[in-house]
Amino acid sequence: GFDDQMSYINEEFRCLEKVTLVSATEHKEFPNYLSFDQPAVINQLHLSEDPDITFWKFPVRNQNKFERLFDLLCSFRGELSIVFCNFREATESVCTYLAENGYDAIVYHGGMEQDERERALIKFRNGSFHTLICTDLGSRGLDIPEIQHVVHFQFPQSEEAFIHRNGRT
């Protein structure tokens, strides 16, 4: 998504002898905009054999999905949680359902203006809302260590998205 911008930056820093790139995910190949003579992966982080993540699976019929999500979120008793949906419309539907049932949550997706997204994150971080309902936009770049729960209301469409979503905890 940022190939043009990264190509420009790469050209501007051609004079540098060493370039260090950091990524949250491992890639098989370097992006096209990079032209390293001798690329190397240094100090690659490997996940521990015993990560501090517990996965739970709750099979639910589609017609009961909203109700079960509501029950699950209530069981978290105020701990910060993120609920991931695949589409903006789904985030709005989930948030509306929860609000209609007395549960306050806030949405975060790419269809919002930048200032709206920033306000949503501020309200989530400061505890005004304990649940953030978001698209995969929220799976990257959010660093909120207090997040205790990640819920996949809609299962991600790729393994990479699954990894990034769960990385929020």
Where are the model-predicted features located?
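Post-DEXD/H (motif II) to motif III coupling segment of the RecA-like Helicase ATP-binding lobe
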Residues: 1-47
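Loop/turn-to-beta-strand initiation segments
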Residues: 15-20, 79-80, 104, 127-131
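Conserved helicase ATPase core of P-loop NTP-dependent helicases/translocases
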Residues: 91-97, 102-139
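Conserved interdomain hinge at the start of the Helicase C-terminal
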Residues: 8, 51-100
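A short beta-strand element within the Helicase C-terminal
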Residues: 131, 140-155
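Conserved nucleotide-binding/hydrolysis micro-motifs of P-loop NTPases
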Residues: 18-19, 25-29, 47-49, 62-65, ...
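Conserved SF2 helicase motif VI
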Residues: 121, 158-169
